[in-house]
Curated annotation (Swiss-Prot):
Belongs to the UPF0473 family. It comes from the Bacteria. Transmembrane segments: none annotated. Disulfide bonds: none annotated. InterPro entries: UPF0473. It comes from Streptococcus thermophilus (strain ATCC BAA-250 / LMG 18311). This is UPF0473 protein stu1961.
Amino acid sequence: MSHNHDHNHDHEVITLVDEQGNETLFEILLTIDGREEFGKNYVLLVPAGAEEDADGEIEIQAYSFTENEDGTEGDLQPIPEDSDAEWDMIEEVFNSFIDEN
């Protein structure tokens, strides 16, 4: 999934830690409420400070998440590649987001 729009606005940031303990800072591009259809929410992330490639695009990562009861943190999970219904919904919402921005 790629993303191409004006970055002259602030994004919330999140730090992801990989299996080796390396921390990477990401900007939260978009959150999606998918609880009604899939029982979870989704977040689209871009690496903090990422520059557009030659085609004017930036790589986007998508995760599902469940917030803790206090709404402050939660667990991010990769979205299964074979979950076509989830990916279709994410793509539809993302495309609407891009069209509006």
